[in-house]
Amino acid sequence: MPTVVNYKDYIGAIQDFPIKGITYRDIQPLLANETVFRNSIKDMGNLIDKKPEYWIALESRGFLFASALSMIYGGGIRLIRKKGKLGNSQLVRVDYGLEYGKDSFEMANFPEKKGTKVVIVDDIYATGGTMQAAETLCKKVGYEVTDQLCLIDIGIVEQHEVKCLINY
């Protein structure tokens, strides 16, 4: 059962950051409140039907949410990092667009069984470029993405499959 919390009360808004025209959603107030953070994790987990074998954590704030989801719901964690931050020799890479630029993601290509069920986790859903890149990496490795999960949808893309706890 979802908790009754107005999570937007715990999200700050910083205008024109990181560039003019962008409103940065600051999750620090939510993270600073232990009860609200815990409830947000439980409510995020309740958005998906089946718990995965792995939570795929996107750099960097996705690490916070995927770790907490793993602790509450079980399952391991796999990291997707920005280019050049993983030391593994077996890496898969993809380039993608952001709402204000371009970047690259990398993921270790662990020898796992094909079709391992995963849920991709991040803090913010904006244009969908990050989630699409993460899904591409997961498929290259052989994972089956069962869900994509974010704390916040900032409302740029009207229709998408990503499950978000807070919608603007």
Predicted regions and their residues:
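Short, glycine/charge-rich flexible loops or terminal/linker lids adjacent to PRPP-binding catalytic cores
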Residues: 75-119
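Short Gly/Thr/Asp-enriched flexible loops that form oxyanion-binding sites at enzyme active sites
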Residues: 64-73, 135
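Short glycine-rich phosphate-binding loop at a beta-alpha junction
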Residues: 51-59
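PRPP-dependent phosphoribosyltransferase catalytic core
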Residues: 2, 9, 132-168
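Generic enzyme active-site microenvironment
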Residues: 57, 120-121
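Acidic, divalent-metal-coordinating active-site segment for phosphoryl/phosphodiester hydrolysis
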Residues: 122-135
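Active-site-facing substrate-recognition patch
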Residues: 1-52, 110
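Conserved acidic residues
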Residues: 53, 116, 146
